[in-house]
């Protein structure tokens, strides 16, 4: 499922800087994981150890044109054809986008909690259910404040259970 950049801007409550048309199919928080730059929306997350804004120039050179930022980079003239979606909190914007995406699907979602064994149980359920239905599951151990929204983004029109 793809969203227009206009729709994403509305869904996350951003102020858009840039006017390029774009359809977003992929979300990115780690510049090392780029696969489809023309359809990617990069969230410049900030943490104690890192600032996603420092990867914008590199990602732009690699073909990404759509960015969610809390701080617009200097020298916008160096980014022709780019869209910057300005928000107060990029993590909150990522979570909000995933929440709105989830609202598009009236399917059952299985949540697994506990201290140990969540990934193993998730994989067992996938093996049990996937022969008879289309299952979308989180890749790896995506169970953090960043991983859950990225997992929810994988839901699509064919998904019967997540």
Segments (PLM) and residue ranges:
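Phosphate-binding loop of NTP-binding sites
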Residues: 92-162
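N-terminal leader/targeting and accessory segments in enzymes
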Residues: 1-96
């Amino acid at each position: 499922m793809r969203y227009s950049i206009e729709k994403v801007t509305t869904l996350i409550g951003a102020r858009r800087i840039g006017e390029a048309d774009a359809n977003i199919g992929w979300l990115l928080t780690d510049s090392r994981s780029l696969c489809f730059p023309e359809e990617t929306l990069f969230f410049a997350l900030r943490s104690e150890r890192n600032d996603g804004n420092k990867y914008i120039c590199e990602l732009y050179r690699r073909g990404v044109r759509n960015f969610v930022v809390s701080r617009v980079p200097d020298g916008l003239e160096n980014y022709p054809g780019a869209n910057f979606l300005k928000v107060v909190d990029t993590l909150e914007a990522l979570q909000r986008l995933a929440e709105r995406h989830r609202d598009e699907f009236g399917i059952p979602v299985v949540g697994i909690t506990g201290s140990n064994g969540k990934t193993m149980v998730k994989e067992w359920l996938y093996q049990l259910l996937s022969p008879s239905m289309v299952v979308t599951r989180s890749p790896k151990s995506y169970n953090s404040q960043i991983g859950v929204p990225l997992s929810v983004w994988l839901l699509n029109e064919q998904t019967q259970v997540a």
